[in-house]
Structure formats: structure tokens, C-alpha cells
Regions:
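Gly/Ala-rich beta-loop-alpha elbow adjacent to hydrolase catalytic centers
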Residues: 91-95
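Conserved HGGG/HGGXW glycine-rich cap/lid loop of the alpha/beta-hydrolase fold
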Residues: 15-60
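Residue-identity detector for glutamine
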Residues: 4, 33, 39, 74-77
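Active-site loop/oxyanion-hole signature of alpha/beta-hydrolase fold enzymes
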Residues: 49-90
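Alpha/beta-hydrolase fold catalytic core
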Residues: 1-23, 44-47, 80, 84-86
Length: 98
């Protein structure tokens, strides 16, 4: 799966089956979505979303001050864009605070 871009957000969505649950992985400070790449193959019976937080990896730099609210809004924009209604959220370090 190659990286996709939406309004400056960089993400990968491994959609396998509409009946599968979706897991969203959020990386920690100073990292990017690649830290979760090895997890994707472990969840063969799930759809998986990994993405770069604003100011990280290939996502754009934030226009204003960085905050947890800004990161939460970014997640909402991505899940609304790809029409995910329910998901399991897994975060590491900063990603666990969103």
C-alpha cells in the first residue's frame, strides 16, 4: 500500500473487508507511521490505518500551535475522509494521549 495524502495528511489504509474491524495505530513523538509497518501483517483479519501526525513524517507542518486537540482533529479528518465509523485505537507515547 502506498502513502495517500489528504489536506496535507499522510496515511496508509489497509482495507481488506467491510466486515472486519478497523484498528488505528498512532505513533509517538518524533516518529512516523513506519513504526507500525510490521504490525499490519499481524492483523490479517482487520482493516488497519496508520498515519503521520502533523509535523511528522510526510504530513504537513501544523499552521498553528501543536496541541493534542489539533492531533485529535487530524484523526477525525482522516477517518471521516475514508468513512470509518468505528475503530479500535492503539497509541504509543504521544499517540496514546490523543
Amino acid at each position: 500500500m502506498k502513502r495517500q495524502y489528504f489536506k496535507g495528511h499522510c496515511f496508509k489504509y489497509f482495507f481488506k473487508n467491510p466486515k472486519f474491524k478497523t484498528i488505528v495505530f498512532i505513533h509517538g513523538l518524533g516518529l512516523n507511521q513506519d513504526v507500525w509497518s510490521w504490525q499490519v501483517s499481524l492483523f490479517k483479519n482487520h482493516n488497519v490505518l496508520i498515519y503521520d501526525l502533523l509535523g511528522h513524517g510526510d504530513s504537513k507542518d501544523p499552521e498553528g500551535k501543536i496541541s493534542l486537540s489539533l492531533f485529535a482533529e487530524q484523526l477525525l479528518q482522516i477517518i471521516n475522509h475514508i468513512k470509518i465509523e468505528k475503530f479500535i485505537l492503539i497509541g504509543f507515547s504521544l499517540g496514546s494521549m490523543i
